[in-house]
Amino acid sequence: MEAAEKEEISVEDEAVDKTIFKDCGKIAFYRRQKQQLTKTTTYQALLGSVDTEQDSTRFQIISEATKIPLVAEVYGIEKDIFRLKINEETPLKPRLVCSGDTGSLILTNRKGDLKCHVSANPFKIDLLSKNEAVISINSLGQLYFEHLQVPHKQRATKGNGQNTPAATSQENQEDLGLWEEKFGKFVDVKANGPSSVGLDFSLHGFEHLYGIPQHAESHQLKNTRDGDAYRLYNLDVYGYQVHDKMGIYGSVPYLLAHKQGRTVGIFWLNASETLVEINTEPAVEYTLTQMGPAAAKPKVRCRTDVHWMSESGIIDVFLLTGPTPADVFKQYSYITGTQAMPPLFSLGYHQCRWNYEDEQDVKAVDAGFDEHDIPYDVMWLDIEHTEDKKYFTWDKKRFANPKRMQELLRSKKRKLVVISDPHIKVDPDYTVYAQAKEQGFFVKNPEGGDFEGVCWPGLSSYLDFTNPKVREWYSSLFAFPVYQGSTDILFLWNDMNEPSVFRGPELTMHKSAVHYGDWEHRELHNIYGFYQQMATAEGLIQRSKGKERPFVLSRSFFAGSQKYGAVWTGDNKAEWSYLKISIPMLLTLSVSGISFCGADVGGFIGNPEAELLVRWYQAGAYQPFFRGHATMNTKRREPWLFGEEYTQLIREAIRQRYALLPYLYSLFYHTHVSSQPVMRPLWVEYPDDLETFAVEDEYMLGSALLVHPVTDPQTATIDVFLPGSDEVWYDSKTFAYWKGGCTVKIPVTLDTIPVFQRGGSVVPVKTTVGTSTGWMADSPYELRVALSTQGSAVGELYLDDGHSFQYLHQNQFLYRKFLFCSSVLTNRCANEKGHYPSKCIVEQILVLGLKKKPSSVTTHLSDGRAQPAAFTYCAETSALRLEKLSLRIGEDWEVRVG
C-alpha cells in the first residue's frame, strides 16, 4: 500500500472496464438462490401461532427443508400501505433492519376496500382490492432466507447439526460462495456466512413497470428472462454503458407498476446488494368457442412477476396500493420523505469543470458570462482546488485568497460549490484525518484497524457515516471558524461516495469492512453515500444556525436522499446516445422520489461537437438540475467558445431557463409538500392513455408543459405525441395549436426547443432575465394563459425569499392561484396562512386559444378600481396579448375580457 500511495493517481484509474465489474453469474448469492429455487422448497404459514396487536399481525412460517422457523409480521399502515417483515425467530446474531383460521388469515384496512389474504400451505399473501387480486407475494414459491450459521471452525464445539446449504462439499461451497467468494484477485471472506434473502411478487394485470434506479436504461423496465437482472449496487462506473442493467452510482429499491385504473408500488427496504428479475406473462386471448364469456375475463389478464434478491438483511417490504400515480407518490413520501425545498439559486445554471485552475481562471470564466450576456448562478470547484486532495483545505498557490474570490461572486449575487469526498488522506499532519483517527471515526478492517484504500489523495481512510457521532462531527467541519476560507455563499458537492476505492473489488470498499455497530459493509453498502449527504446538508444548516436552506449534490444515493438535496447521472460521455438516455434516467429518478436530478450538460467525458452541446443545453434548460460539467482532459467548453452562432443558441436556452424559474420554483414547492414529481413521464399525467405508458423521448414539466428534446444529429423534423384526445396543445414559441390524442410532425432547426403548453394551464414566467437569480427577485411577471377546449385555464405561483426556512417556520410565502373562466382571469390567494411582501407585478398577460378578438379588456382591483387595458390580438394564432400592466402579484384582482 505504501508503494500505491506514491503512484500517480489519474482519471484512468477509474476508467470503465466491464471485466472489473460483476455480472449476475459472478454473484454468489444470486447463483445460490437460482440453484436452490430449482428444487422444491415450500414454506408453510403456521396460522395457529397468530399474534394480533393493534397495528400488526405476527405469525410463524417454516420451510419443509430446514424446519427453522421464521417470523412474519404484517402491518396495515394508514394511507393504504401494507408492510411485510420476515426475519429469523432466533438468529445467531442480529440481522440488519434498515428500519384465527388455521387455513388462512384475512386482514382488512379501515375502509374495507383493501384486504390482505394470508394462505397457510403453501405460504402466500394476496393483496386484494374490491376482491380482485392486485399483488400476490410468494405465489411462485421463491421465498428464500439463509439462516445465519455457526462458522465451520466453531461447529464442533457448538454442536450445530442443522441441515443447511452449508453442509455441502468443499468444492460446492466454493462455487456457491458460502463462506468466501472469489472475484479476480479479491477474496471476500464472510464472517457470518451466507445470509441472503429473496421473495417474489406477482402484479396482476400489470405489464408496465418503472423505477429501481440507477441504470442507464429505458424508463419502462425490461424483462430479464435472459438472466441479466437489474443490479442495485452503488459503483463508480466511469463512462458507463448505455442500455445496461449493471448497477452504477445510486440505488433506490423501489418499483412502480401501472395499468389503466391502478398504480401500485413495491419498496424493498434493504441496503445490501440487490438484484431484481422481471418477467411479464402477456395477456392470453380466448375466443368464445374456447370458453364461455363469463370465464373469459379473468383469463385475459396479463401478469408481471418481480423477484427481489438481496445479499443480506431481512425481508422488509412496503406495498403501496395507490390507486392513482399521485396516491403512490404520496404513500412513498410518507415512508421516505419529500424532496427538500431547494434554494432558488440552485435552480439556475451551474458552471463546472474538473478543474478551474486558480482564482484568476474563476474570475475570467465569471466575467465571460457577463461579457456574453449569459446568466448563471453557481461556479464549481473540483478536487484540484484543495491542498493535495485534502478536503476542507485550499491550494495555497492557486487559491490563496478564497474569501476574496467568493466576495467577487457575492457582488454578482452568485454562489460557489466545492467538492468534499468521503475518503480522507492518510496524513497525521492533516487536521481532519488526525481528529477522525483519534476518535475512531473511520471504517474498520476485519482485524480492527482502520480500513485503507487508494483514491484521489493516494492512501486514504473512509469516514464511517453510518455512525451518528461521525455525522455530527462531520457536520461541525462546515462551521465558518473551522472551514477556513469558507463563506455563506459556499455550498457542497459529495462525490466518490459509493464509496469509490481505486483497486478495490469492483472499485469499491471490501464487503468485509466493518462499520459502527459491528455491521459488515455488505449489509449497508448502498446507504453509505446517503449518510454523507445527510451529514453535509445538516452541516450547512447548522452553520447558519438553522436559518438557511442547504444545497448539496451527491453522486451516490438511496431511498430518501431527496430530503437532503440533488443527485445527477454521473460520469456520462459527450455522445448523442448519452443525451438520449438521460431522459429516461431522469424520469426514473423522478418517479422514485428524487425530483432534483440532472445530467452533466455536454457529457462529462470527451469533446462534444457544437450541435450536440447546443441540443444538450436545450434539454437541460427544461430539466430540474442544470449543470455543465467536463473532465480535466477535455477541451474547454464554456458557452462562448464555439462561435457566435452557437453562443447565441446556448444563451437563448439558458435565458429560457431563467424566464421559466417562477414556474419551476412553484413545481418544487409542490413536490416538497405533496411529492408529485417535477419532471414527469406522460403516463403520470395521462394514467388511462395506453399510448403514454412507454413514451420516454418526451416528458411533462409539471402538468402544464410538454418537452420533446431533440436528441439526434442533423434533425429536420421530429414526431411529437400530444396526449389527451379532448385536449389542445400550443407551441410555446409560435403559438400554433393542435388537438391532442395524436402524433404531429414538427419541423425543427437548431434554434428549436420543442415545448408545448397544455390547454387549460397558466404558466408564470419572468419578463426580464438578470445575470443571476439574485438580480431577478423584483422582476415583473408574465402570465401565459393557454385555454382548454372549454375556454378555461388554471395555474399557480409560489413565492418566498428563495433561501431561508422562514417559509416553513414563519409562513413567509405567497401562494397564488390563477383562474381563467367565463372570459375572466382572476388572481386569488391559494393559502391564507402565507404572507410575504413582494414588490413584483404582473406586467404582461398572454392568452392563447381566444377564438375572437375582444371588444374590450379591463382590469379590476380588490378596492373596486377598474381601468381599460391596452391589448393586441392576432387572429392567425388566436392570441391576445396585454402589456404595460401593473397588477401586484400578491393582491387579488381580475382581468375581464369583453
Curated annotation (Swiss-Prot):
Q: Where does the record place the catalytic residues?
A: D495 (nucleophile), E498, D571 (proton donor)
EC number, as in UniProt: 3.2.1.20
InterPro entries documented for this protein:
Gal_mutarotase_sf_dom, Glyco_hydro_31_AS, Glyco_hydro_31_C, Glyco_hydro_31_N_dom, Glyco_hydro_31_TIM, Glyco_hydro_b, Glycoside_hydrolase_SF
| Top-level lineage group | Eukaryota
Q: For this entry, list what GO says about its biological process.
A: glucose metabolic process
- Asked if Electron transport is a keyword of the record, the answer is no
Q: Which CDD domains match?
A: GH31_GANC_GANAB_alpha (cd06603), GH31_N (cd14752)
The record's region (Disordered) falls at: 154-173
Q: Which Pfam families does UniProt cross-reference here?
A: Gal_mutarotas_2, Glyco_hydro_31_2nd, Glyco_hydro_31_3rd
Keyword annotations of the record: Glycosidase, Hydrolase
- Ranges of compositional bias, category Polar residues: 157-171
Q: What class of enzyme is it?
A: hydrolase
Under catalytic activity, the entry for this protein gives: Hydrolysis of terminal, non-reducing (1->4)-linked alpha-D-glucose residues with release of alpha-D-glucose
The residue ranges crossing the membrane are: none
The GO molecular function terms of this record are: alpha-1,4-glucosidase activity; carbohydrate binding
Presence of the UniProt keyword Methyltransferase in the record: no
What role does this protein play? Has alpha-glucosidase activity.
- What family name appears in the similarity comment? Belongs to the glycosyl hydrolase 31 family.
Q: What is this protein called?
A: Neutral alpha-glucosidase C
Which species does the entry assign this protein to?
Answer: Mus musculus (Mouse)
